[in-house]
Amino acid sequence: NYAQALPHLFPAMERTLRETEFRVGQNSEGHQVFRNNLPIRPTRHDFHAAADGQLGGILKAYRDWRISGDQKWIAELYPLLVQSLEYCIRTWDPRETGALEEPHHNTYDIEFWGPDGMCSSIYAEALNALSKIGKALGHDTSRYDTLLAKSVHYLEERLFNGEYFAQQVMWRELNAPDPTQAMTFHSTYSEEAREILDVEGPKYQYGNGC
C-alpha cells in the first residue's frame, strides 16, 4: 500500500502485480494470500488474509486503472475485485455495520479484535473504489454505496474520539472463537494472560492508543 512510484514510472509492470494478486494469490472464495511464491505458481491458503493488504489491493487496482485508462483490463479484473471484497465483508464485517469487527490480521503481524481506524478506513476506501469502478462499467453498486455510508458514519461517530481514530476492542460479541483458541501469528496465552484477557481483552490491541 505504501509504494507509489512504480505505478507512475512503470505502470504496465505494476499492473502485473495486480494480476498476480487477484489471479494467482486469490482462491475461489476470495481469500488472498499476502505472500505469493516465486517463481509464480499456485499457493496454499492456510492462514489469515491480511485485511489492510487485501483491501489495499482493490485500491491499487483502482489507482492503476486511473493511471492507465485501460478499460478492458479493469473490466476483466472486476469480477475478481468483487470476489475479494465480498470475502472481506463476509469474513470481517458479517453484520455489515461498515466496520471490520471480526479479528483481522494486518501489517503489524497481529489481529485487531474490533474495529480500528487504519483497517476500517481502508475498508471504506475499498468500498468507494469498487463502487466507482462498477459504475464506470455499468454495474449496480448500491450495495457498496450503502456500506460506504455506514462505514464513514461508523468511523466518525464511533471511532473518532475528538482527537484521533481509536480502536474499539471487541471479542465476546463476535463470531470468532475465544481469542485463546483462535488461530493467530506466534501468539499463545499463558494462565496469567488468560486472566488479563477477562479484564483487558485480547493481546496486542491498540485500544485508545494512537
Q: Where are the language model's segments positioned?
A:
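Catalytic cores of carbohydrate-active enzymes
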Residues: 92-118, 122-210
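Substrate-binding groove/exosite segments of carbohydrate-active enzymes
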Residues: 1-90, 101-105, 195-210
